[in-house]
Amino acid sequence: MKELILASASPRRKEILDSLGVLFSVKISNFDESSITEKDPVKRCILTARGKAENLFKTLPQNEGAQKLILAADTLVFAENTAFPNEKIIFGKPKNEKEAEMMLKSHSGSLHFVVSAICLLDCKTGQINEKHSVSKVFFKKLSDKEISAYLKTDEWKDAAGAYKIQGKASFFIEKIEGSYTGIVGLPVRELYEILNKTEFRIL
């Protein structure tokens, strides 16, 4: 059977695969995400996941990769831009607490979207399979006190959109529409569909 390599340092993605009983190893991709200049958030997310997979593939010794599948993923948070309807506001990972505060204030009392893309690369054939999910997240109106308290948890660090839905940010979520695991960082239905096209089985 093929061996699965997760090209991600994300503990959330590792936790999801572990919870599904999937056997995998981890190798970190050094792909430069800033090299993707695509403005559309969905296309950008797909291209970033693909870039991560292809970057790791190039680093594997030729005789090592024949029976391996590389799984890469990317997650972006975005919102509609009322001033410029044809553009989207993309929320990456905040660089500092001030940036995280601005993102949380933007989410407060409003709707935003979370796109997660996955890319599966067969190291033997070079074949790529890709899927993505787009989910809606509705935040309650946040008080300054709530934002301040959440920032002190440090959950905003290394989190697209400055929050982790599986943590204390769940207190702020009124509802979601779409894939919960996609919002966390790895949409499992899409993962199941992609892996079913290969010799790798998770069910």
Swiss-Prot record:
Catalytic activity: dTTP + H2O = dTMP + diphosphate + H(+); UTP + H2O = UMP + diphosphate + H(+)
Cofactor: a divalent metal cation
GO CC list: cytoplasm
Transmembrane regions listed in the UniProt entry: none
EC number: 3.6.1.9
Annotated site residue numbers, Important for substrate specificity: R12, T75, Q166
Active-site residues, Swiss-Prot/TrEMBL: D74 (proton acceptor)
Any GO BP: nucleotide metabolic process
Function: Nucleoside triphosphate pyrophosphatase that hydrolyzes dTTP and UTP. May have a dual role in cell division arrest and in preventing the incorporation of modified nucleotides into cellular nucleic acids.
HAMAP family: Maf
Protein name in the entry: dTTP/UTP pyrophosphatase
Organism (species): Treponema denticola (strain ATCC 35405 / DSM 14222 / CIP 103919 / JCM 8153 / KCTC 15104)
